[in-house]
């Protein structure tokens, strides 16, 4: 389509929808035709390459005057995808499926076996290097990778979620947990209803991820696992690169090797893999490995580094002289990570890499989550609930075990991710003191009022009051309700004088004030409930 304009007796032809925004975007249908891919393969390719749809500012210009809703991509992104070698593998896999269907129809078992052995496979190494040119860029995107792979590590096998993907997710997450333990990089842990939140400082980058609680996972139909499986497939390759680099930085062998062999006569690969997954045994390091610290740093950076080193030393020595035994009902992985990060030893029943057993006399603490019978208790060890480990780690000091005994009502488990975590306990103590002081004051006032009443009665009995007719006087009392009504009426009159363009802003401010008052009231009620429960 074209139209023309006149400029000093010269006709200039202008083609509509062939320049500007109309050429910068391309619809998904045109992209599929250009790449000659199915919608399923196109989605996989976009996820792997990190290409996402975009919303144009002027849909009518891009869609050639039409207002129909469509999915748009940048044309340069589609041109970028056209040169991807994985597209050829997708086409080969399509041919493989066609040949496999023919062989199954003919019941040719040898042909089927040969096709399965030679089926096309693709590698994602070059895509990982392309999307993360530096190691720091990979660490910045590590949060999503860990959250997804920890979720896939406990999912049941299905047609979409293959056993190899679940096994790879479990292996890589266990390797990352070992790095967190060996490098003492864990900073915060918080247990919530959704799961367990972790925060660690990995090579200068803060990484936060969530791990679900240990429970059986049933069939979930509300989630599109085909999309998530593609993300997990990419993150598996990415985490392999990251784990290798992290293990090299702290002097560990990769793949990981245990520091000592178990007493059990199990030399097969599965037994070794189970011992690595248990997180109870340390890993072996390179010989003559020394941790390198950059000496060319300024004074300000040096002070920050000293604070971090002091914090790391506190964490290392927190459980240094303790041995823990975990009962069957408590979560193993999270407690093993925290205890071993703080220098302690941990073991449990049927632990693949157990260094000691339940009857060991050197055990100092036993973690239980249900009341024990007196006949089953050992006098030489302390019995505490799991929250004691979490709270002690977040406070960087071993707390008193009186509040964490089996069967006791636990204190509130505070989140270390909140900004007022350090001052919250001080506020709770102040509130307790204030509540006690207010209770004493009210009791004292009541007793004083009773004493005054009794004294007045005695005085009235002792004195003989003459009979005098006295009329009661009338006190002028202000009607508070009338005052409030007048103030409200004045406020409404002032609101009516607000211009129309300012009225919406005023209503937003008013709603915000009401919401803050309501939230403050709810928080105060919750705080009083927590104080009553703590007392």
UniProtKB/Swiss-Prot annotation:
Cited InterPro entries: BRCT_dom, BRCT_dom_sf, PES
Start and end residues of each BRCT domain: 314-406
Pfam families linked: BRCT_2 (PF16589), Pescadillo_N (PF06732)
Biological process according to GO: maturation of 5.8S rRNA from tricistronic rRNA transcript (SSU-rRNA, 5.8S rRNA, LSU-rRNA); maturation of LSU-rRNA from tricistronic rRNA transcript (SSU-rRNA, 5.8S rRNA, LSU-rRNA)
GO MF terms, alphabetically ordered: ribonucleoprotein complex binding; RNA binding
Function of the molecule: Required for maturation of ribosomal RNAs and formation of the large ribosomal subunit.
The protein's name: Pescadillo homolog
Organism: Brugia malayi
Classification lineage: Eukaryota, Metazoa, Ecdysozoa, Nematoda, Chromadorea
Gene: Bm13949
């Amino acid at each position: 389509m074209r139209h023309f304009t006149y400029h000093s007796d010269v006709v200039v032809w202008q083609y509509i929808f062939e320049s500007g925004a109309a050429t910068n975007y391309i619809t998904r249908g045109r992209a599929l035709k250009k790449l000659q891919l199915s919608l399923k393969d196109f989605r996989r390719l976009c996820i792997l390459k990190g290409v996402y749809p975009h919303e144009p500012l002027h849909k009518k210009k891009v869609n050639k005057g039409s207002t129909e809703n469509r999915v748009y991509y940048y044309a340069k992104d589609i041109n970028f995808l056209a040169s991807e070698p994985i597209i050829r593998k997708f086409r080969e896999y399509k041919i493989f499926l066609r040949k496999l269907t023919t062989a199954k129809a003919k019941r040719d078992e040898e042909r089927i076996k040969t096709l399965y052995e030679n089926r096309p496979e693709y590698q994602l190494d070059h895509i990982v290097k392309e999307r993360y040119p530096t190691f720091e860029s990979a660490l910045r995107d590590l949060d999503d990778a860990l959250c997804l792979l920890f979720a896939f590590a406990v999912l049941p096998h299905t047609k979409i979620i293959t056993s190899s993907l679940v096994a790879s997710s479990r292996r890589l997450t266990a390797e990352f947990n070992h790095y967190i333990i060996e490098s003492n990089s864990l900073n915060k842990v918080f247990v919530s209803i959704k799961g367990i939140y972790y925060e660690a400082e990995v090579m200068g980058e803060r990484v936060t991820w969530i791990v679900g609680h240990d429970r059986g996972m049933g069939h979930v139909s509300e989630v599109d696992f085909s999309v998530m499986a593609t993300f997990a497939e990419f993150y598996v390759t990415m985490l392999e690169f990251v784990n290798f680099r992290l293990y090299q930085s702290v002097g560990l062998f990769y793949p990981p090797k245990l520091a000592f062999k178990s007493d059990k006569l199990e030399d097969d690969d599965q037994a070794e893999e189970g011992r690595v997954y248990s997180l109870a045994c340390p890993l072996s390091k390179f010989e003559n490995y020394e941790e390198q610290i950059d000496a060319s740093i300024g004074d300000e950076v040096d002070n920050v580094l000293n604070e971090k080193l002091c914090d790391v030393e506190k964490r290392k020595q927190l459980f240094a002289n303790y041995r823990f035994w975990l009962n069957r009902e408590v979560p193993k992985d999270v407690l093993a990570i925290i205890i071993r990060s703080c220098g302690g030893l941990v073991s449990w029943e049927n632990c693949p890499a157990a260094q000691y057993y339940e009857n060991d006399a050197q055990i100092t603490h036993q973690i239980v989550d249900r009341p024990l019978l007196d006949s089953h208790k050992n006098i030489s060890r302390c019995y505490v609930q799991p929250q004691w480990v979490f709270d002690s780690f977040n406070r960087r000091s071993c707390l008193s075990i009186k509040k964490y005994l089996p069967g006791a009502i636990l204190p509130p488990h505070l989140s270390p991710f909140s900004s007022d975590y350090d001052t919250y306990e001080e506020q709770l103590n102040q509130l307790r003191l204030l509540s006690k002081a207010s209770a004493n004051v009210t009791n004292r006032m009541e007793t004083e009022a009773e004493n005054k009443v009794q004294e007045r009665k005695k005085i009235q009995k002792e004195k003989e009051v003459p009979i005098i007719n006295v009329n009661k006087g009338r006190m002028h009392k202000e009607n508070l309700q009338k005052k409030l009504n007048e103030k409200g009426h004045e406020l409404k009159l002032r609101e009516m004088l607000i211009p129309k363009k300012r009225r919406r802003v005023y209503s937003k401010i008013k709603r915000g004030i009401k919401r803050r008052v309501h939230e403050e009231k709810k928080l105060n009620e919750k705080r009083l409930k927590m104080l009553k429960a703590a007392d």
